[in-house]
Each structure stands twice: as C-alpha cells, then as structure tokens.
C-alpha cells in the first residue's frame, strides 16, 4: 500500500489500546487510507468504515459538509477537512475520525497549488486537529500517498 505502514501500525496499536474504532473520510486519496489501514492484520478490531467523498456534492450529502463552507473556503481547506471528519464521526460508531482532502493534480492555482493536502483528526467529545501540507507538483500518485 502507499501510506507509511509503520505509522499506520502505530495508529492501530494506539486505537486498540484506547479501545477505539477509526472511521475515515477521504477525497483526493479515494480510499487509499482505508485500504492501507485494512492491510494491517486484525484491522477489524480498530477500523470501522471509510467514506469516499470525491465530489463536493458527496461531501455535503454523505458527510454533511456545509455548502457555505465549501463556497467560502473551497473543498481543499482545513475547514472542510474538519467538517468531513466530524461528519464521518457523527455517522458512524467510531470514536476517532481521520479526513483527507487535497489537490492531487494536475492543476491547482497560485492560491491552492497542486500537492496541497488538508488533514483533520477528531475524536468523540474531543478537539479536532487540522493540518495542511504542501507536497508540490510531485505527481498524483505521490500526493495521494
């Protein structure tokens, strides 16, 4: 798989230790995070489900991302990543949600270039942490991984 399996293994150990279940909400990665998590033996003990919400319409209809947030900040923003994570958590029996939205390329703009990826992690009754990474024009496959 494409994600750093060592880091995902550490995440799985932590989730098991906390008796937590993980849900993912993915846009630009189109399910690669979910696929990578389920490569870990015993993943059914910590991974519940994943949502692939590639279009803006699916972000609103499936995860409850607000149209006004999409219009104001764009699909690739920490604000949308946060709403994706919170929406996934609300619609699942999980206690931890991870979301990813970005511009895999080609394309982008000066304001939101190719390789821009926004992440959010939230837990039930907890804070949401967001982060934006700029990987640059390294190609779709590398941005998505």
Region spans (language model):
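Short alpha-helical segments enriched in small residues
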Residues: 1-145
């Amino acid at each position: 798989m494409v994600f750093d399996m060592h880091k995902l293994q550490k995440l799985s150990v932590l989730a098991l230790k906390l008796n937590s279940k993980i849900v993912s909400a993915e846009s630009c990665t189109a399910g690669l995070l979910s696929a990578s998590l389920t490569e870990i033996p015993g993943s059914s003990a910590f991974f519940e489900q994943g949502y692939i919400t590639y279009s803006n319409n699916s972000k609103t209809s499936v995860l409850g991302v607000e149209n006004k947030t999409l219009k104001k900040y764009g699909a690739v923003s920490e604000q949308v990543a946060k709403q994706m994570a919170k929406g996934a958590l609300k619609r699942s029996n999980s206690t931890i949600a991870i979301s990813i939205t970005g511009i895999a390329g080609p394309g982008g703009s000066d304001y939101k270039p190719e390789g821009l990826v926004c992440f959010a992690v939230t837990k039930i009754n907890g804070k949401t942490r967001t982060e934006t990474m700029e990987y640059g024009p390294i190609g779709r496959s590398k941005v998505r991984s």
